Amino acid sequence: MNSLTFVSPKLFGLLPISIPSFRPFVKRDKSVYNRKEFGHWEADTVVSGKGKSKACFATLAERKTRFYIAIKIPDRKGSTLAKAVIAALSQLPKGAVKTITCDRGSEFANWREIEKALGCQMYFADPYCAWQKGTNENLNGLLREFYPKGRNLSRVSPKTLEKNLALMNARPKKVLNFQKPQDLFELFLKKCCT
């Protein structure tokens, strides 16, 4: 385990927050890399345009099925994001959340709270290595088709977000042999958790 420093995104008055004992990306099990096992997630945030609002989406992608979840949250505080992630993933059966890989943003400062509540392990990508959680980054890009950069996300209704996520999860993907993430996710939920 290493020590991790989170840096506030503000340009002036940076306040590093030292987080001890984080798990680096390279410590993940091989089953996470090769996508053979269900229940490994990637997490990130999609933010509003500069100066528009503090509202953002907490996003989660299951690596094997490419199933995607986005939750609108009022700000990027660690406590806010932790509550949203716990609320979304705690609805799933035990065994559906084994690991979560995220970046080193300050919004993940409450990672131990997430681990404890979900019974999973969290791993942190290396700085400036977005490819280490590429599934989530790719899906965030697809979400931007509905909510382009610069958009005030505080104005997005939960119903509209839910509808757009349903469209994304119902889109057949070549990487999944033209199966839909929603269908695969439901299939693996039944297999792993019954």
Regions of interest found by a model, annotated:
Residues 115-194:
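Charged alpha-helix within mobile-element recombinases
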Residues 13-56:
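Mobile-element integrase/transposase regions
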Residues 57, 67, 94, 121-125:
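Polytopic alpha-helical membrane proteins, predominantly small-molecule transporters/carriers
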Residues 1-19:
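Conserved short alpha-helical interface segments
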Residues 95-110, 128:
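Acidic/histidine-rich, metal-coordinating catalytic segments
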Residues 49, 53, 70-94:
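Active-site beta-loop-alpha junctions of metal-dependent nucleic acid enzymes
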Residues 3, 44, 60, 66, ...:
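Mobile genetic element proteins and their domesticated derivatives, centered on retroelements
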Residues 55, 62-63:
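Extended hydrophobic
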